[in-house]
From Swiss-Prot:
Disulfides per UniProt: none
GO cellular component terms given for this protein: chloroplast
Pfam families: DUF565
Keyword Chloroplast: yes
Source organism phylogeny: Eukaryota, Rhodophyta, Florideophyceae, Rhodymeniophycidae, Ceramiales
Protein name: Uncharacterized protein ycf20
Subcellular location: Plastid, Chloroplast
Similarity comment text for this entry: Belongs to the ycf20 family.
Record key words, sorted: Chloroplast, Plastid
Species in which this protein is naturally found: Aglaothamnion neglectum (Red alga)
Length: 100
């Protein structure tokens, strides 16, 4: 019985740590997007060019990472993917703020 509880505890510990790492990377990506989009706005009207560069870099990274099947379950790749999702989410939120 104790062994079963130990296995369940280890399973939950791994998944809770994985979930917290994914949430932190998502919020970090959102924070990066806020920083990246705020700096060019102060110096001029560079919003469209900044968004174009961010999406271009994001798609290039995705093409490089997902071209190899051995990197699909790597924790670093999952963290980078969470940061990329946070950056794209930040772009959507920023565009809705500008539209209202």
């Amino acid at each position: 019985m104790q062994f079963i509880l130990y296995i369940i505890g280890q399973y939950l510990y791994y998944h809770i740590n994985n979930l917290s790492l994914q949430l932190i990377s998502l919020f970090l990506g959102y924070f990066f997007c806020t920083i990246i989009c705020s700096i060019p706005k102060e110096t001029g009207d560079w919003g469209l060019i900044t968004a174009l560069l961010i999406v271009g870099i994001n798609e290039t990274m995705s093409a490089l990472i997902y071209s190899y099947k051995k990197y699909e379950n790597n924790i670093i790749v999952k963290t980078i993917n969470g940061i990329k999702i946070g950056i794209i989410y930040g772009l959507f939120v920023d565009s809705f703020k500008l539209g209202s």
